[in-house]
């Protein structure tokens, strides 16, 4: 056997198992495609068809089946895709569905919706309150819902003094306190008109003090009775307002500093022959004088020994007060003091040394001088003289307050003011004293 033939035999032997498997697979496929009756009919008709034609038909059928399967697979995919789209279209929002509406529908119904919106806006503006002071926005962001701020009680035409009388001063307050807390706390004793918490100018933190003003003055003592009660865990202190005293102190301070404006001085212990022109010549070098009034007796026209001088500038009046108080004029030391007008219409006179005005031209002034000299020398005056000096001081106070003029008090009146004692009193004589007639 030749080598070529041997190779062919070996190759056929190696391919034989594979050919058997292919033949068996082809038979199985033919059996599946053709049922038993078909196979029997074909066997009866004879062996007219060849094996090659049978294999070709089988391959065609395979290709048709694969095409059908791929087509079915595509159809199923398209069905799944359509089902997914339909499901998503159902879950879409109504707003997105409205986008697919036709333009004709929008043109037809757009004007109606716009007119409806305009009517709704007009209705809302009509119902909503107008923007004005006293309203503030609440927690809602809508401008149609506003929270009214607490309405402050209307203020009558009250003077500052009357408002101060209805105000209390609160101390020792908690740092986190608010005006609403104080209003709720004091509303138990009366209607609160205003609350002011004093805060630091730089840090804006509360200083722990506040002013509370009531509508009725009867609520002030009740509010003061709340002292010691705890507000936000801290015992509160309530006092009457010191605003009037603070105002007067500020006015006096302004006068001392010389902040513009007129100032009135009292000039006393004058000789009876001193005239207004003499006083003007003495006081005018210190500044411009607006008015000089020398008090005189209405019957005799004689000077009473005191008067009032008004300077146009308080600084000039202050210098005159410092320089001329105690200045000796016609043998008498002048008494110069500052005049303060009181709310009741009276006047208060204060001197730099704190002494009261002594008028040596009257009996009361001489009594007071005697008491002052005796006190400085350590001599005890008799009880009658001490009582007379006290009565003279009382009369001088009445005269300074404007209640009773000192000239209207005669010695009999001074005697009536002193207590009547039936005991003998000690007396002493003073000699070498000047008299008004010898001046």
UniProtKB/Swiss-Prot annotation:
SMART domains tied to this protein: RRM
Keyword check for Metal-binding: no
UniProt tissue specificity: Highly expressed in placenta, liver, skeletal muscle, heart and kidney. Expressed at lower levels in the colon, thymus, spleen, small intestine and lung.
Protein family (similarity comment): Belongs to the splicing factor SR family.
Subcellular location: Nucleus
Name listed for the protein in its UniProt record: Probable RNA-binding protein 23
Residue numbers spanned by region Disordered: 13-159
Annotated positions of the Phosphoserine modification: 128, 149
Span of domain RRM: 166-243, 263-341
């Amino acid at each position: 056997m030749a080598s070529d033939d041997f190779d062919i035999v070996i190759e056929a032997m190696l391919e034989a198992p594979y050919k058997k498997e292919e033949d068996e697979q082809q038979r199985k496929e033919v059996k599946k495609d053709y049922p038993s009756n078909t196979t029997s009919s074909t066997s009866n008709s004879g062996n007219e068809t060849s094996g090659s034609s049978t294999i070709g038909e089988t391959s065609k059928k395979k290709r048709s089946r694969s095409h059908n399967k791929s087509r079915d697979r595509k159809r199923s995919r398209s069905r799944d895709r359509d089902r997914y789209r339909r499901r998503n279209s159902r879950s879409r929002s109504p707003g997105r569905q409205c986008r697919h509406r036709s333009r004709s529908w929008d043109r037809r119904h757009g004007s109606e919706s716009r007119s409806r919106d305009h009517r709704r806006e007009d209705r809302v503006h009509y119902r909503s309150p107008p923007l004005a002071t006293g309203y503030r926005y609440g927690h809602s962001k809508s401008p149609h819902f506003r929270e009214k701020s607490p309405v402050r009680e209307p203020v009558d035409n009250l003077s500052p003094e009357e408002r101060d009388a209805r105000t209390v001063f609160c101390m020792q307050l908690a740092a986190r306190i608010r005006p609403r807390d104080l209003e709720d706390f004091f509303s138990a004793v009366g209607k609160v008109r205003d609350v002011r918490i004093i805060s630091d100018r730089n840090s804006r933190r509360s200083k722990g003090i506040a002013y509370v003003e009531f509508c009725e003055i009867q609520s002030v003592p009740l509010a003061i009775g709340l002292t010691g009660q705890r507000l936000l865990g801290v015992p509160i202190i309530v006092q009457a307002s010191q605003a009037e005293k603070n105002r007067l102190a500020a006015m006096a301070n302004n006068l001392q500093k010389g902040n513009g404006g007129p100032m009135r001085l009292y000039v006393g212990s004058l000789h009876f022959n001193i005239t207004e022109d003499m006083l003007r010549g003495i006081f005018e070098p210190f500044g411009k004088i607006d008015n000089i009034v020398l008090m005189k007796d209405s019957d005799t026209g004689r000077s009473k020994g005191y008067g009032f001088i008004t300077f146009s500038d308080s600084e000039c009046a202050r210098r005159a007060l410092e320089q001329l108080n105690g200045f000796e004029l016609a043998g008498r030391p002048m008494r110069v003091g500052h005049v303060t007008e009181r709310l009741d219409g009276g006047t208060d006179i204060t001197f730099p040394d704190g002494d009261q005005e002594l008028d040596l031209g009257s009996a009361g002034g001489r009594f007071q001088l005697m008491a002052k000299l005796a006190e400085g020398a350590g001599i005890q005056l008799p009880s009658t003289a001490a009582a007379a000096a006290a009565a003279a001081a009382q009369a001088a106070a009445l005269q300074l307050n404007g209640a009773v003029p000192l000239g209207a008090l005669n010695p009999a009146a001074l005697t009536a003011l002193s207590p009547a004692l039936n005991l003998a009193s000690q007396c002493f004589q003073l000699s070498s004293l000047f008299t008004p007639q010898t001046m």
